[in-house]
Design a protein with these regions (language model features):
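Transmembrane alpha-helices and membrane-interface helical segments
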Residues: 98-105, 156-163, 199-207, 274-284, ...
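Intrinsically disordered, polar/acidic, low-complexity terminal segments
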Residues: 5-66, 70, 80-99, 103, ...
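Individual alpha-helical transmembrane segments in multi-pass integral membrane proteins
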Residues: 83-98, 127, 144-152, 186-187
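Signature aromatic-anchored transmembrane alpha helix within multi-pass, membrane-resident enzymes
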Residues: 174-175, 219, 223, 295, ...
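Membrane-interface micro-motifs in multi-pass membrane enzymes
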Residues: 117-162, 268-271, 305-336
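Alpha-helical transmembrane segments
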Residues: 5-19, 118-125, 179-180, 218-223, ...
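Membrane-interface transmembrane helices that cradle and orient dolichyl/undecaprenyl
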Residues: 154-174, 210
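Transmembrane catalytic cores of multi-pass membrane glycosyltransferases
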Residues: 21-89, 141, 175, 182-307, ...
């Protein structure tokens, strides 16, 4: 028992300190800038948040304009006007501790595993390695409050739901508490609340004979909270056209692409693992699989609901949209491993935990080192931008970080890129932020070989590029080039595929690539050295490069 307490205290202390340091070296980004300003009836204003009253009026308008996440975004706006980030860093680190503790409590109640310290550490290790896009779900203010803190509410609700289901709370005077608690837990982020709400409905329809009046109060509260979020005028306006389309082909293609992103681009590692585990168990021993699903039926219904929800909404491009799906997958995976622990040899059990801790320490060290470098780069970016006359700065970021899982540092040479716009507004610079990568900046300002014949992509349009650039560049003969131009890009496979020696495969790939084209915009860039048009390579799929660029009238 003493060893268990020591292990638990040490684990909690280490995790708190580890995340406090990561948060300390995580600068503002994206929506952290946006939510520093008030919302009015006409949208986001240029007036900064300065008081609690400002937050209340701002969130009232935000509900009708943007989305219904009033509770979480109230916290985001509260942290946005603090003079420093110490309070947020402490609370966000505590949120990690609370979430892992609630996961462990829930698993203990469901499985009966009573070695809580080991369960807590094991839960954290799985969470660390499997949580989707930690840079967007655990670190920055808006992201962590929307996803991490909402996950705390969801796990707290699941623990309370299990406790009420098994122990009663039959007294009528508990009703207000259960309803209000349900509302608060459901009134978070629709990406997490909707899947749980659908799972609860399916679960209680399936187990309608076991439902109690206390559970009805709790579930009704959660459904009310979820409804407040998803029925807000702001979120309905944003979702307009997301679910419906007059083109059946487009509808099907978007959902197929959503399925692809879900399993291959959105870092849904836990989902892939638990799906594979259940498929293997189906062929190995269907009785064990049936028993596992029966014991975890609520989680299973939530998991299926999240899958359906993600596919119907064509799945968000960022992995953070999979937070609810991955959270339930992690719970199912941990529950499964606890149930089959007797089948794992004692020797293997003794090896697995130290091995995971060793990998964690290496991963954390590289992540913290990268966060420190990123923080220094952002400070340099702010300083250079404030001192600049035209808003154009050389990117201070390394070409590649050692470990970028906990980083979000995407600034662009496109002044209309959301990160750039938010940054410019926050620092009140009259010129929009334009971050040129080191290669492009040096080519344009220090002279180089960019505009040589061997870098020419298309003679008619006059676009050039080189491997280290993130865009295609064309000179303009006139000053003050402020007009975007529509272009059509005819594409081909890039040099990556030159390693293929089979002439038939190369010929086939070449013919296929010639049929791929994309319409996009060439955006203006005015510097004291000249005027240019830029086409960003991130507009094209990976391993695809421009073969011909045509201006469209």
């Amino acid at each position: 028992m003493r060893k268990e307490k020591i292990l638990f205290i040490f684990s909690v202390s280490f995790v708190f300190l580890a995340f406090f340091l990561l948060n300390t070296y995580t600068p503002r980004t994206m929506d952290d800038f946006h939510y520093a300003f008030k919302y009015t009836d006409s949208g986001r204003s240029s007036e900064r948040i300065s008081s609690i009253l400002d937050i209340l009026t701002s969130q009232f308008h935000h509900y009708f304009i943007s989305n219904g996440r009033t509770l979480v975004h109230s916290f985001v706006q509260f942290f946005s006007f603090q003079k420093n980030d110490i309070l947020f860093n402490i609370l966000n680190s505590m949120a990690i501790i609370i979430l892992i503790t609630l996961i462990s409590v829930y698993l203990k109640m469901k499985t009966g595993y009573n070695k809580f310290a080991k369960l807590w550490l094991f839960s954290f290790l799985f969470f660390w390695f499997l949580v989707p896009s930690p840079s967007l779900t655990l670190m920055w203010k808006a992201g962590s409050v929307n996803y991490l803190w909402t996950s705390v509410l969801i796990m707290g609700f699941l623990c309370l739901h299990h406790n009420v289901s098994t122990s009663g709370f039959a007294e009528r005077w508990w009703a207000p508490f259960l309803i209000i608690t349900g509302i608060l837990c459901g009134w978070g982020h629709e990406g997490l609340s909707v899947g749980v709400a659908l799972g609860l409905i399916l679960y209680h329809i399936y187990n309608y004979k076991k439902i109690s009046i206390s559970i009805i109060y709790l579930v009704i509260g959660f459904l009310i909270g979820t409804s407040i979020v998803i029925l807000s005028p702001g979120i309905l306006r944003r979702a307009d056209g997301l679910m419906l389309t007059t083109d059946i082909f487009s509808f099907v293609v978007k959902r197929l692409m959503a399925f692809y992103r879900m399993f291959f681009e959105a870092q849904t590692k836990a989902t892939m693992i638990i799906v594979i585990v259940m498929i293997v168990q189906f062929f190995r021993n269907r009785f064990i699989l049936k028993e596992f699903i029966s014991k975890n039926s609520l989680l299973f219904f939530c998991f299926i609901s999240f899958l359906i929800f993600q596919l119907l909404t064509a799945f968000p491009g960022h992995a953070r949209g999979a937070m609810g799906l991955e959270l339930t997958a992690i719970l199912l995976l941990l529950s499964y491993l606890i149930n089959i622990r007797s089948e794992i040899s004692i020797k293997a059990q003794k090896i697995i935990m130290p091995l995971l801790i060793f990998i964690l320490l290496i991963d954390y060290s590289s992540a913290l080192s990268s966060c420190i470098k990123n923080s220094a780069s952002v400070k340099m970016l702010v300083s250079n931008y404030i001192d600049s006359n035209n808003g154009i700065v050389r990117s201070p970021f390394p070409k590649k970080f050692l470990n970028d899982r906990f980083l979000w540092y995407r600034y662009s040479s496109d002044s209309s890129y959301p990160q750039n716009v938010a940054f410019s507004n926050f620092y009140e610079h009259e010129k929009p932020l334009i971050v040129l990568n080191a290669g492009l900046y040096d080519q344009l300002y220090s002279g180089g070989d960019l505009f040589k014949k061997y870098n020419l992509i298309d003679l008619k349009s006059g676009f050039y590029t080189s491997p280290e650039l993130d865009c295609y560049v064309a000179k303009q003969s006139f000053k003050d080039n402020s007009q975007k131009k529509n272009v059509k890009i005819n594409c081909g496979f890039d040099s990556f595929f030159q390693v293929i020696k089979n002439k038939h495969i190369v010929s086939l790939m070449d013919r296929v690539s010639r049929h791929y084209s994309k319409k996009t915009e060439a955006k203006p860039l005015n510097t004291e050295k000249g005027s240019y048009l830029l086409i960003f390579k991130y507009d094209l799929p990976k391993r695809i490069s421009a073969r011909e660029i045509i201006f469209i009238d």
